[in-house]
């Protein structure tokens, strides 16, 4: 398995299995099959509505948690400091994990500044191992980094 090292030193598998548009009734089986053939990076999102099924697969797969890399994304309806923080804690429960390896802000709309502050706080608490963004243009990324 090849890895990329993120800016904070966390190693992320280069190849991941994404669950976008996988039906709830198929998701758990698909994730279990992906893990069985060697995938260790599973990518989901709040807006995919299948975090719970991913969590079921994680808990049943028999692979130690530290060998898996789980990514999820906060949806814009959950932006703002309080809503983002609560949504991430809810995602952790659905995923049945004590921490999430990578949490991304899914889109550059609404109060992503507040959401980013929540991610930073949860990162500091060890509930998130890495923070990132998805679908952000360079100028929006520069705004957050400032």
Language-model-detected regions and their locations in the chain:
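Short active-site-adjacent helix-start/loop capping segments
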Residues: 51-52, 78-80
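Context-gated lysine
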Residues: 11-14, 24, 36, 60, ...
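N-terminal, well-ordered alpha-helical segments
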Residues: 32, 52-56, 72, 86-89, ...
């Amino acid at each position: 398995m090849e890895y990329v090292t993120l800016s904070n030193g966390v190693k992320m598998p280069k190849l991941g299995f994404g669950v976008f548009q996988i039906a709830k009734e198929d998701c758990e089986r698909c994730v279990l099959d992906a893990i069985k053939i060697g995938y260790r990076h599973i990518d989901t999102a709040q807006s995919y509505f299948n975090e719970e099924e991913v969590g079921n697969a994680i808990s049943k797969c028999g692979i130690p948690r530290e060998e898996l890399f789980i990514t999820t994304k906060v949806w814009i309806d959950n932006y703002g400091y309080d809503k983002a923080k609560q949504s991430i804690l809810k995602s952790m429960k659905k995923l049945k994990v004590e921490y999430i390896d990578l949490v991304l802000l899914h889109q550059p709309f609404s109060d992503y500044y507040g959401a980013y502050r929540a991610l930073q706080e949860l990162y500091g608490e060890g509930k998130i191992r890495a923070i990132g963004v998805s679908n952000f243009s360079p100028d929006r990324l520069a705004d957050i980094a400032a």
